[in-house]
Amino acid sequence: MKVTQHIENAKGETLFSFEIIPPQKGKSIQELYDNIDPLMEFKPPFIDVTTSREEFIYVNKGNGLLEKKLTRMRPGTLGICASIKHKYNVDTVPHVLCGGFTKEETEYLLVDCHYLDIDNVMALRGDAMKDEQSFVPTKGGNKYASDLVSQIYQLNQDRKSTRLNS
């Protein structure tokens, strides 16, 4: 169900939802469930799941040299969304970023949302990378959240409930 439908169906009643951050690589999803379980008593109609921008890390190559490598420290947004939707029977809202994604990668993510029956996304420009003074869009990606919303709309013909935040 779309977030807008949840709000309409509430008929003025207060709704509680929350936003979660995917665990770091190597952590168990069970830790995430352990944090979500006590919050389910509030009956959230939907749960937002953030997407972390990629970042540079330095990896020791073993010969005293460091290699600069681009990585995501908290991957798995869509997998977590699908898992929460299945385990708790609650709608999920993955964050979709301009930063770190080409338009083609965004399209693939939206196709995955469709296959997973995820009807909502939150479109965000995203933050600048840690070593950038200001936001620099990914080559071949969207510069503004409004551009991202336009892409989502065009690809899905308004199938998704898109919340805009820049």
Question: Would you name each region that the model predicts?
Answer:
Residues 132, 136-160:
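Phosphate/pyrophosphate-binding betaalpha-module
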Residues 19, 47, 113:
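Conserved, mostly hydrophobic/aromatic
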Residues 160-166:
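Conserved small/polar residues in nucleotide/adenosyl-binding loops
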Residues 23, 42-77, 129-140:
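Glycine-rich, proline-tolerant flexible connector loops at the mouths of alpha/beta enzymes
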